[in-house]
């Protein structure tokens, strides 16, 4: 199956400002690279390369297809990336939240994609994923997307807590903290996580584990979505979520109920015997 991405810039700016138009296309390619890196075990500066399958004169309408799949990726990842990109742009057009499957960095790149667009679809951009020539995902993108993503990436609250999920996208360097992406098992968030050097051993043990719990300083946006985590602890978890009989009787937070089961606790709140 062949997979392609169609981009169609509308309005007078599409045929007038070549620099802005090319910058928009470049921002789309940067967004695809970021989404691809968050999907794979280890990211790379050299992601999948793309070629123009169609490029029409007199307007900015083009169709991109994979030219060479990156070594750290595969065809299934590339197809997921395209669907995630288009679906996410559609979500960002309607809500001030980080789109499903996007990191905060992807949201910042999405801002760049939409920054030069107009305020209505007739001066915006149409994007579509095509599989074997058939449209399977579409979105209309306007300047509203840039405003919504800017609001979504603005930090509003810092707390201390934890999230559970699977680590991917590990980046290491001599002069920078190790970084990775946590795909949460609840809510499906894709969260950038930074680790201190003191967590190097724990990080390597946790790498490619199905389930880990990362504890640390959590930065959230106004919608309660996690923008990033500065980890202070990593805990390895069983492959499948497991609860003991005691946990099932008393709940996930038995201290909250004083060890009582849910029925007794609610009756006590109501003043029952």
List each model region and its residues.
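Protein-protein interaction interfaces in oligomeric scaffolds
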Residues: 1-142
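Short boundary/loop segments of OB/S1/cold-shock single-stranded nucleic-acid-binding domains
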Residues: 143-160, 203-204
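Structural detector for short beta-strands of small beta-barrel domains
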Residues: 158-175
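OB-fold and OB-like beta-barrel modules that bind single-stranded nucleic acids
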Residues: 164-169, 209-218
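Short aromatic-glycine-enriched beta-strand elements
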Residues: 173-183
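Short nucleic-acid-contacting surface segments enriched for D/E, G, S/T with interspersed K/R
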Residues: 197-215, 226
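OB-fold/S1-family single-stranded nucleic acid-binding modules
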Residues: 219-247
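Extended, charge-rich, solvent-exposed interface segments
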Residues: 238-273
């Amino acid at each position: 199956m062949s997979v392609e991405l169609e981009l169609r810039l509308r309005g007078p700016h599409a045929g007038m400002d070549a620099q802005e138009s090319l910058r928009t296309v470049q921002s789309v390619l940067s967004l695809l690279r970021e989404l691809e890196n968050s999907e794979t075990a280890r990211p790379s500066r050299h992601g999948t390369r793309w070629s123009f399958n169609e490029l029409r004169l007199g307007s900015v309408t083009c169709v991109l297809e994979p030219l060479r799949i990156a070594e750290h990726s595969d065809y299934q990842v590339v197809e997921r990336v395209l669907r995630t990109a288009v679906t996410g742009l559609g979500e960002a057009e309607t809500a001030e939240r980080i789109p499903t499957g996007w990191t905060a960095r992807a949201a910042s790149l999405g801002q760049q994609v939409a920054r030069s667009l107009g305020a209505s679809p007739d001066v915006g951009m149409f994007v579509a994923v095509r599989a074997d020539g058939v449209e399977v995902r579409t979105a209309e993108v306007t300047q509203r997307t840039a405003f919504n993503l800017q609001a979504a990436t603005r930090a509003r609250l810092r707390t201390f807590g934890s999230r559970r999920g699977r680590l991917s996208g590990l980046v290491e360097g001599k002069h920078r903290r190790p970084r990775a992406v946590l795909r949460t098992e609840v809510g499906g968030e894709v969260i950038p996580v930074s680790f201190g050097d003191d967590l190097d051993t724990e990080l390597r043990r946790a790498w490619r584990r199905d389930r880990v719990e990362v504890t640390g300083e959590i930065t959230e946006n106004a919608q309660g979505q996690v923008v990033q985590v500065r980890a202070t602890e990593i805990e390895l978890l069983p492959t499948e979520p497991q609860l003991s009989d005691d946990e099932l009787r008393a709940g996930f937070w038995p201290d909250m109920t004083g060890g009582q089961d849910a029925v007794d606790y609610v009756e006590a709140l109501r003043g029952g015997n």
